[in-house]
Every structure is written in C-alpha cells, then in structure tokens.
Amino acid sequence: MTIINLTQHIATHEQVAQGVIDLQGDDLAQLKKLLNFVGMPTNGDIHDRAFDIARLADQSGAEAAMIGGAPYLMPHLQKALQARGIAVLYAFSERVSVERVVNGVVVKTNEFKHVGFVEVTV
C-alpha cells in the first residue's frame, strides 16, 4: 500500500519500510504552507485547507495518507481524504527507555519507536 506522508515531519526509516512516501519539492512546500496557520483560522479556512491537502494526496496517487498535526484540522482532513477514497492513518509509536553511558555517566532517554498505523474509518 502506498501511504503519502501529510505531516510536516520526514517519515522514519520504519515508516518508509511500511510504504510511506514523503512529498517533495513544491508539493512539500505547499503542504507545509497549508498545515501552518498564522492567526486564528475560521471554519472556512480549516475546511479549505483540508480540501487542498486532500487534493495533494489524491494527485500523488496514494491509497492512504499518514496525517497528524493541529487537532482542529484533523477531522476536516480526515473527511476530505475519505471523500476521495483515501484511507486515513495515524502513526502509532511506543516510548522505549534507552540507557547510554556518556563520559562515565549513565544517561537515560526516551525514544519513540514506530510500531504501525491506526486506521480511522469514522
């Protein structure tokens, strides 16, 4: 399954291995512009941007889209994608505690490991 990345972040190696493709060039620049709101958006602004992002996904030929970002945009984007027959996926990751020795000191950090996708069908 081809999954278009509709987030502002580059797909991880694990996500790429599962079929995620990042937008490139002008399409990526357009996506970032559409995902970033300057000032308080109206419902019309949100709806229009969701429609335009879904159009980018449709033009890519992807069967599914990995989405994430502003919570007020996601329901609109989900509907716009589903209206075009594009499956909606959210990345699911687990927090993994990692200990490393740095200069003789144990440093504990948390890393997020991609596990898979949650498909939203409502």
Language model regions located:
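Gly/Ser/Thr-rich loops at beta-strand to alpha-helix junctions
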Residues: M66-P75
